[in-house]
């Protein structure tokens, strides 16, 4: 089992509100990164990971994955269908991918729990929209396993921000990690991030 990632920087985290779901998100990040790394090495679909990050993630060490996983926001995204009940009628493995189903199920369970306990953290940490939070809260637990078979329900986060993934995989200095942490802990900041990546951090 992967060890719990260390928080990025004490100063940045002390500036954040009380985020009791943060550790759970970081643990899911670590599992998700290892999952994507395996898929890269086996030449499987890597769920939208930007091309520029694939080489670095494919060869990343366990220690680097621990560091990247500690980013205080989900590195994955759930894409819930607008009408969950209709999807569930036909949900089922057309081409079974049990590992993807297991990963999706774990994230769905955690996202639903966070949505029920703290919609604010569900938005900030999981990147969920208000309508998605409402759908998850209304969904019976018995339907989560079936929903996890929905094609495309799980993707990488920040698929349009190659610079962010490159920075995550290359930033080793505390100052660089702190900049990313401060960005991640501002609600709504994701849509304001530049589409073009800034200068690379110094390794």
Predicted feature locations:
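Intrinsically disordered, low-complexity acidic/Q/S/K-rich activation/interaction tracts characteristic
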Residues: 2-42
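N-terminal interaction modules that seed assembly of large macromolecular complexes
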Residues: 34-79
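Extended, low-complexity, amphipathic alpha-helical coiled-coil/linker regions that act as scaffolds
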Residues: 12-22, 27-29, 51, 132-139, ...
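Surface-exposed polar/charged interaction patches
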Residues: 38-42, 94, 114-117, 150, ...
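Intrinsically disordered, low-complexity linker/tail regions enriched in Pro/Ser/Thr
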Residues: 2-15, 62-97
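Long, compositionally biased
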Residues: 71-92, 150-189
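Long, low-complexity acidic/proline-rich regions
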Residues: 192-203
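Amphipathic alpha-helical packing elements
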Residues: 43-47, 54-57, 100, 104, ...
